[in-house]
């Protein structure tokens, strides 16, 4: 009765209710093999269809609800017409391959049926049913059979790499900064004399205690002094320079609409991140910020610069472009100049641009220079741009994060071609999500994206060949867990704070240890645990030894079963045709877009005709084309980069490349290592170069004096004879000591000799 009316009836005392046992899916996934765990995840995704996908939690109160930092910039970017993405091309090729495999299998089954025409009809029906079931299983599951799963579920072996203990010859020379930065360890944000709007923003962002670099920098920055600070990545440098700058702007409001603060950053993504943090810190005050980085719309940036924002965050190239082509924009009113990641900006092609920007800035300014490592170039820049700077050294960037677990996989000699197979095995079997894979070149990153995508993994890529929209979209998808693996070059190795990165894999060892520390610094950030796995060949053993020597925690060597590597190597060889097919689709699409663009321009010219307005003047630059060409040639790594010199060399290189054809796996790996070695060689040459002569010697920071070792006094013949001091004379008269006599084997000499005192004589009586 109650059930008919729609009511829930009560349970009686005598009734037994079946309670389903609770299972923890996460525990099951960890215990079971990872290949099978992938299927369970797919089933769980299908189960989530019971819930309404449109359901959204209510937004947090306040202007900034902790949403993604780059979402605003991504919305501003112009979205091009929907062309097929790389993932769509990969999916198309995968489907084509699957249909071909099915057709081949169905052809085999038909032949078997023809061979067994004389069999009973019941047996035929059973065979048909089995074939249908098998095909359904193949569609739902991955491409692996039960035999493959037995190989794939073999466990890797881990060994602890012990470093060879050697006697220390002496303390190594430290960096340029002395480790004597005085700051109050108990200092809080409330004790820093910051304005209420800033304290409110700090609380809204969830900051509780300042980091060491913030405790050291903010009080000095508020005094208006120049700062030369050295701190590792992920230590809160952005807030360390943003808070004193914002406090200065609030305390001293502007009289005229001018830009007063300039922040220079090396990469676009880091610029967007700094802009986002600054905007959030200034959310409760009327300070305006502007972002001028490459890849974004030039016209909208020019309009924003005409409005004279208080703070400008820019990359060097785009800033110089605006300075030479935007008439109303200048840097003569800059009060504070901030150089973030200065060592990175002077590493490659920014040196001349940095000098040009500093030349155009106001001379009466406060300058803050932040650098992870202090090179000679940074030192030169500091001597030119800073006036009586306060040197702050909190922590060097030569150490990895404390909770990072470092693992290395040895690549045997003549086995360099196994790198792709090993990476694929790691990503398919062990590290399935929240992984960053670093490669040396853009070409290899693109290839790994295609290869892993064809294996059915959710992959994205991030490198310099992509447009700004594609780069930000890849970061957004990785952050939102739409993709599990992000393949990147060193563009993503600096400054980017990507939440939840569990594992970093190095396809090859990077150029220097400094680059290695930056790469593995993407994980184990802010006290979290993380893991790095690096593939090390014979030519990279020297760097491995240095890393093991510097490591505080034990370093482990991971050994993959040979069966697994061979299995994935065979699979990659079979996929080469599919990789080529995806690359062909990309090339065709590029040609189509190019021809469409030419047709559109021709149509526009025909429509406008002679009445067309004069074209816009070309954008000027501080260097001529020849000067830029010379600079590129000087910094080129190898011969094909030197093709910039002329058409003949370029044609010659292209002919040789066509003759060779497609590179093998061994050649690709060697090419990656070669690039890293050439960079390291160039760096070594630069370090050997004679330093610039100066009229006045620079003030070197006073290094901590080395501990004096107790020197054993050695007797010297001439010194004993010529030393006429009171102490030496007394020692000479006393003769050798008891210990010296013992060493020389002399008998113990009684001081008194045979002389008997009166007291002794009296006792005998």
Swiss-Prot record:
- Chain intervals for the UniProt region annotation (Disordered): 1-48, 88-148, 685-765
> Basic residues composition bias: which ranges?
685-694, 744-765
Span(s) of short sequence motif Nuclear localization signal? 164-169
Q: Which SMART domains match?
A: DEXDc, HELICc
- Residues covered by the Helicase ATP-binding domain: 218-392
Keyword ATP-binding in annotation: yes
Domain (Helicase C-terminal): residue spans on this chain? 426-572
Q: Where in the cell is it found?
A: Nucleus, Nucleolus; Chromosome
Short motif Q motif, span = 187-215
Q: Where is this motif: Required for interaction with the PEBOW complex?
A: 55-57
**In-chain residues carrying the UniProt-annotated modification Phosphoserine:** 25, 48, 135, 146
Quote the EC number.
3.6.4.13
Q: What EC class does the entry list?
A: hydrolase
**Which spans does this entry mark as compositional bias, Basic and acidic residues?**
98-119
Annotated InterPro entries: DEAD/DEAH_box_helicase_dom (IPR011545), DEAD_box_RNA_helicase (IPR050079), Helicase_ATP-bd (IPR014001), Helicase_C-like (IPR001650), P-loop_NTPase (IPR027417), RNA-helicase_DEAD-box_CS (IPR000629), RNA_helicase_DEAD_Q_motif (IPR014014)
Q: Which reaction does it catalyse?
A: ATP + H2O = ADP + phosphate + H(+)
One GO term in the molecular function aspect is: ATP binding
Q: What does this protein do?
A: Probable ATP-dependent RNA helicase. Component of the nucleolar ribosomal RNA (rRNA) processing machinery that regulates 3' end formation of ribosomal 47S rRNA.
What PANTHER family would the database entry show?
Answer: ATP-DEPENDENT RNA HELICASE RHLE-RELATED, RNA HELICASE
Similarity comment: family membership: Belongs to the DEAD box helicase family. DDX27/DRS1 subfamily.
Please describe the quaternary structure of this protein: Associates with PeBoW complex, composed of BOP1, PES1 and WDR12. Interacts directly with BOP1 and PES1.
Protein name from the UniProt record: Probable ATP-dependent RNA helicase DDX27
Organism, as annotated? Bos taurus
């Amino acid at each position: 009765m109650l059930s008919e009316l729609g009511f829930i009836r009560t349970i009686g005392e005598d009734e037994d209710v079946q309670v389903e046992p609770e299972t923890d899916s996460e525990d099951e996934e960890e215990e079971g093999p990872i290949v099978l765990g992938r299927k369970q995840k797919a089933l769980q995704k299908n189960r989530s269809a019971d819930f309404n996908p449109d359901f959204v939690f209510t937004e947090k109160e306040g202007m900034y609800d902790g949403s993604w930092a780059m979402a605003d910039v991504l919305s501003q970017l112009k979205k091009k017409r929907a062309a097929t993405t790389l993932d769509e091309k990969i999916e198309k090729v995968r489907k084509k391959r699957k249909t071909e495999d099915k057709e081949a299998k169905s052809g085999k089954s038909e032949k078997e049926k023809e061979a067994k025409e004389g069999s009973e009809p019941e047996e035929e029906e059973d065979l048909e049913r089995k074939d249908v079931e098998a095909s359904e299983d193949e569609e739902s599951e991955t491409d692996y059979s039960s035999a493959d799963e037995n190989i794939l579920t073999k466990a890797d072996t881990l060994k602890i790499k012990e470093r060879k203990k050697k006697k220390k010859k002496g303390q190594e020379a430290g960096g340029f900064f002395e480790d004597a930065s005085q700051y109050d360890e108990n200092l809080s944000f409330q004790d820093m004399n910051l304005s209420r709007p800033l304290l409110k923003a700090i609380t809204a962002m969830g900051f509780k205690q300042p980091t060491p670099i913030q405790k050291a920098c903010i009080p000095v920055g508020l005094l208006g002094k120049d700062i030369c600070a050295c701190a590792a990545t992920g230590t809160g440098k952005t807030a360390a320079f943003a808070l004193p700058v914002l406090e200065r702007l609030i305390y001293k409001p502007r009289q005229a609409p001018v830009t007063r603060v300039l922040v220079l950053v090396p990469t676009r993504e880091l610029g967007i991140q700094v802009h986002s943090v600054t905007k959030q810190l200034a959310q409760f005050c009327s300070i305006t910020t502007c972002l001028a980085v490459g890849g974004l719309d030039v016209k909208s940036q020019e309009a924003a610069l005409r409005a004279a924002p208080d703070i400008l965050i820019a990359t060097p190239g785009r800033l110089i472009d605006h300075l030479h082509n935007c008439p109303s924009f200048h840097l003569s009113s800059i009060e504070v100049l901030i150089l973030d990641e200065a060592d990175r900006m002077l590493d490659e092609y920014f040196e001349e641009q940095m000098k040009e920007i500093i030349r155009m800035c106001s001379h009466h300014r406060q300058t803050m220079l932040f650098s992870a490592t202090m090179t000679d170039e940074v030192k030169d820049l500091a001597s030119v741009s800073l006036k009586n700077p306060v040197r702050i050294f909190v922590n060097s960037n030569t150490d990895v994060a404390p909770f990072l677990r470092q693992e290395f996989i040895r690549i045997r000699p003549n086995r360099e071609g196994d790198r792709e197979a090993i990476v694929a095995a790691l990503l398919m079997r062990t590290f399935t999500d929240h992984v960053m894979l670093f490669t040396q070149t853009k070409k290899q990153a693109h290839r790994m994206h295609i290869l892993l995508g064809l294996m059915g993994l959710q992959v994205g890529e991030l490198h310099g060949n992509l447009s700004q929209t594609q780069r930000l979209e890849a970061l957004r998808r990785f952050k939102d867990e739409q993709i599990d693996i992000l393949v990147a070059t060193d563009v993503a190795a600096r400054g980017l704070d990507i939440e939840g990165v569990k594992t970093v894999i190095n396809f090859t060892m990077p150029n220097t240890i400094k680059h290695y520390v930056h790469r593995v610094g993407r994980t184990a950030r802010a006290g979290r645990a993380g893991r790095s796995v690096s593939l090390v060949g014979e030519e990279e053993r020297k760097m491995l030894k240095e890393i093991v020597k510097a490591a505080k925690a034990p370093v482990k060597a991971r050994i993959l079963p040979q069966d697994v590597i061979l299995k994935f190597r065979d699979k990659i060889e079979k996929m080469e045709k599919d990789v080529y097919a995806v690359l062909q689709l990309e090339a065709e699409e590029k040609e189509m877009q190019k021809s469409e663009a030419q047709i559109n321009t021709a149509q526009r010219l025909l429509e406008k005709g002679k009445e067309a307005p004069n074209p816009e003047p070309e954008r000027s630059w501080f260097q001529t084309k020849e000067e830029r060409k010379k600079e590129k040639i000087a910094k080129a790594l190898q011969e094909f980069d030197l093709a910039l010199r002329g058409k003949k060399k370029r044609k010659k290189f292209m002919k040789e490349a066509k003759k060779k054809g497609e590179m093998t796996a061994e050649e690709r790996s060697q090419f990656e290592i070669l690039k890293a070695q050439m960079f390291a060689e160039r760096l070594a040459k630069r370090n050997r170069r004679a330093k610039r002569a100066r009229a006045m010697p620079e003030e070197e920071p006073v290094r901590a004096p080395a501990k004096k070792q107790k020197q054993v006094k050695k007797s010297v013949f001439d010194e004993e004879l010529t030393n006429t001091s009171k102490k030496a004379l007394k020692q000479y008269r006393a003769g050798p000591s008891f210990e010296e006599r013992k060493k020389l084997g002399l008998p113990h000499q009684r001081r008194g000799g045979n002389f008997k005192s009166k007291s002794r004589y009296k006792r005998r009586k």
